Amino acid sequence: MCTVCGCAEGETRIEGEHHHHGYDHGHHHHDHAFVRRPAPAEAAPLVVEGLNLHFGQGPARAHAPGLSQSRMVQIEQDILGKNDRYAAENRARFEALSLFVLNLVSSPGSGKTTLLTKTIELLGRHRPLAVIEGDQQTDHDAARIRATGVPAVQVNTGKGCHLDAHMVGRAFEQLEGLDGGLLFIENVGNLVCPAAFDLGEAHKVAILSVTEGEDKPLKYPDMFHAADLMLLNKTDLLPHLDFDVEACIAYARRVNPDIKVIRVSARSGEGMGEWLAWIERQRGARLRARIDALRAQAQALEALL
């Protein structure tokens, strides 16, 4: 997992940005030449149940050859601590612009981009919209977004398997005129690493297609625990599949009892109205919370007069 080893330095490419050699992109990179081999007592506990091997049982909840559990925990704290500082900066910038930001996460092939383009079409031009698009390579998805008339900045992560808050902050610098608008961050297709990385978003939205299997929330619990909403996508295919919708929802709520679930299909239009209504409700709640905070600040200042 990326919180253990970090991602390849110098791989990130952001459209519209001049390349800066040696730019610190927000990840911690340890030098394997100086890693001490752990003593057996420090190694990741291995739990064996029949033919099942469980390596994620130690404090780090992961295993990396040559790294002790304590060292892995320290690396994770360093990486996520640095990322969280960038995320806080992003969140402050977004809030200053009254910009509502969603982080769309899923496995590859879940239909994120198709769902996003349909969402953009249905939202219309009532307020500013933009997309930050994450992929390891190519700008294919960003081109699809731009075809709708909405600006999109492509972030290529190279060997990196997720976006981090520093990448998003740099990509956001390429966008303008988003006051009071919506920003969608389409993360790299990956149900593991993006779960741990706050990008400064208001909500993580997990997209699970009915072609993937109903037990995905149990196999990748961190992602569904981190998400506030699960979009059960490609429901138009259900007549052709052996997919247990109720079991899938139950699994998601076993991991995260508070997760909201909406069944959607960009092709048939099922659930799209409910999805858009959820966006509007959450955006409104965010704005009202900010108004209340500003009023409280104003009252505190008035008390000083």
From Swiss-Prot:
Pfam families in UniProt: cobW
Binding site for Zn(2+): 161-162, 193
G-domain: annotated span: 101-262
GO terms classed as biological process: protein maturation
Record's function text: Involved in the maturation of [NiFe] hydrogenases. Required for nickel insertion into the metal center of the hydrogenase. Exhibits a low intrinsic GTPase activity, which is essential for nickel insertion.
Keywords: GTP-binding, Hydrolase, Metal-binding, Nickel, Nucleotide-binding, Zinc
Protein family per UniProt: Belongs to the SIMIBI class G3E GTPase family. HypB/HupM subfamily.
Binding site for Ni(2+) 2: 161-162, 193
Keyword Lipoprotein attributed: no
InterPro entries for this protein: AAA+_ATPase (IPR003593), CobW/HypB/UreG_nucleotide-bd (IPR003495), Hyd_mat_HypB (IPR004392), P-loop_NTPase (IPR027417)
UniProt name for this protein: Hydrogenase maturation factor HypB
GO MF annotations, alphabetized: ATP hydrolysis activity; GTP binding; GTPase activity; nickel cation binding; zinc ion binding
CDD domains: HypB (cd05390)
Top-rank taxon: Bacteria
Entry binding sites for Ni(2+) 1: 2, 5, 7
The keyword Transcription is annotated on this UniProt entry: no
Source organism of the structure: Azotobacter chroococcum mcd 1
